[in-house]
From Swiss-Prot:
One of its GO terms (cellular component) is nucleus. This is MYB-like transcription factor TCL2. It comes from Arabidopsis thaliana. Residues 37-74 form the Myb-like domain. It is found in: Nucleus.
Length: 100
């Protein structure tokens, strides 16, 4: 019986160590707003309407983009928490492009 308790204790220590490492990795990622062209945005919105959150399938249609980039773009584009980054990026591009 003593041996089974020791195995349970070891297993629970490994599990807790594993989960702590995962959260530290996720929290350390710095997200910056991803700039997409109008064609890429349009394609992402249309594909999302058709297939939903299947980011790997959508990334196969958008040339040069990975599934994680498209998912991050979608989250940042549609969440209220990231709206201040959107405004700052669009404001920068609006004033940096001169009219024809």
């Amino acid at each position: 019986m003593d041996n089974t308790n020791r195995l349970r204790h070891l297993r629970s220590r490994k599990q807790s160590k594993f989960t702590l490492g995962d959260t530290a990795e996720v929290n350390s990622v710095k997200w910056e707003f991803i700039n997409m062209t109008e064609q890429e945005e349009d394609l992402i919105f249309r594909m999302h309407r058709l297939v939903g959150d299947r980011w790997d399938l959508i990334a196969g249609r958008v040339v040069g983009r990975e599934a994680k980039d498209i998912e991050r773009y979608w989250i940042m584009r549609n969440c209220d928490h990231c709206s201040h980054k959107r405004r700052r990026v669009h404001k920068f591009y609006r004033f940096s492009i001169s009219p024809p």
